[in-house]
A protein has these predicted regions:
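Broad gene-expression machinery/nucleic-acid interaction feature
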Residues: 54-56, 193
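A short catalytic or substrate-binding loop motif that flags glycine-/basic-rich loops and adjacent residues
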Residues: 49-53, 188
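Long, compositionally biased intrinsically disordered terminal regions
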Residues: 1-3, 16-19, 23-45, 61-222
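Generic recognition of flexible, low-complexity loop/linker segments
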Residues: 43-48, 56
Length: 222
C-alpha cells in the first residue's frame, strides 16, 4: 500500500504513514476541528516500561456517541496534564488524530462535572459483534475495539469465562479473578452492562454498570 500511497484517500495516506512510524505532530492534531461534548471515562490503564509510564484512557461522548482513546506518556517525576478519573464525566473538547476510523484524540479544557450518564449500549452480543466487524472492515489495523453491550451476565464453563446475553449467545471473555469474584458479588449473577475491549480471539471485560452504578478494576502494571 505504501508504494501506491498517492492513489489512496487522504485518510488512508495518513493512516499508513502512522502505521509505518511517522507520528502525527501534536500541533497538526490540534489544528483540526474539536468535538465538544460531555465525556465519561470508561476505563484507564497504566503501564510502566523502562521508567516511562504510558497511561491509556477510554472515553465516550454523551451527545456525539463517539469513542475516544487518549494516550499520555509520562517521564519519571512528570505530572499528568489531565487527571481523568474512571467513571468521571468531563466537559471539554477532543481533537481527533487523522486517519481511518480514528479513535486516538487529545483532550483540551476538560472540566469535571458532578454528574454521570449511561452510554448508548448494544442491545445484545450479536449486535456488539456486528459493531466489531464493522470497525475491522473499516480499520483492519485495529488491535483493540471498544464495545458497549447491555444485559449480559458472567458464566463459566470449565476454565473458560463467557459473557452471555438474554438470548443465550455467549462470547469468551478475559477477566482477572479478583474482578470476576467482585462482579458475582455485586450482581448476584444477574445481568449487567459492560465495556469491553475486543480482538479477534476474545473480549476483555473492563467496566460494568449494575443498577446504574459504575464499577471498574485497577489495570496497572509496573
Amino acid at each position: 500500500s505504501y508504494k501506491n500511497l498517492d492513489s489512496l484517500s487522504a485518510e488512508w495516506q495518513t493512516e499508513i504513514r502512522t502505521q509505518v512510524g511517522y507520528p502525527q505532530a501534536k500541533e497538526e492534531v490540534m489544528s483540526g476541528v474539536p468535538v465538544a461534548d460531555q465525556w465519561i471515562v470508561l476505563h484507564t490503564r497504566s503501564r510502566k516500561i523502562n521508567e516511562l509510564r504510558t497511561e491509556t484512557f477510554w472515553l465516550y461522548g454523551k451527545s456525539s456517541h463517539r469513542m475516544a482513546l487518549y494516550l499520555n506518556f509520562l517521564a519519571p517525576g512528570a505530572l499528568p496534564e489531565f487527571n481523568l478519573v474512571p467513571g468521571g464525566v468531563y466537559e471539554g473538547e477532543l481533537y481527533f488524530y487523522q486517519g481511518v476510523g480514528a479513535l486516538r484524540a487529545l483532550p483540551q479544557n476538560m472540566k469535571w462535572l458532578d454528574s454521570t450518564f449511561l452510554p448508548s449500549l448494544c442491545a445484545d452480543i450479536p449486535v456488539a459483534m456486528q459493531s466489531y466487524r464493522a470497525v475491522i472492515q473499516t480499520h483492519p489495523f485495529a488491535e483493540e475495539v471498544p464495545l458497549l453491550v447491555d444485559n449480559v451476565r458472567l458464566v463459566t464453563s470449565g476454565n473458560t469465562h463467557y459473557l452471555q446475553d438474554a438470548g443465550g449467545v455467549a462470547v469468551p471473555v478475559h477477566i482477572e479473578e479478583t474482578a470476576r469474584v467482585d462482579i458475582l458479588a455485586i450482581t448476584g449473577g444477574k445481568p449487567f452492562s459492560a465495556f469491553l475491549l475486543a480482538d479477534a480471539v476474545s473480549c476483555e471485560l473492563k467496566t460494568i454498570w449494575y443498577q446504574s452504578e459504575f464499577y471498574f478494576w485497577k489495570d496497572e502494571l509496573n
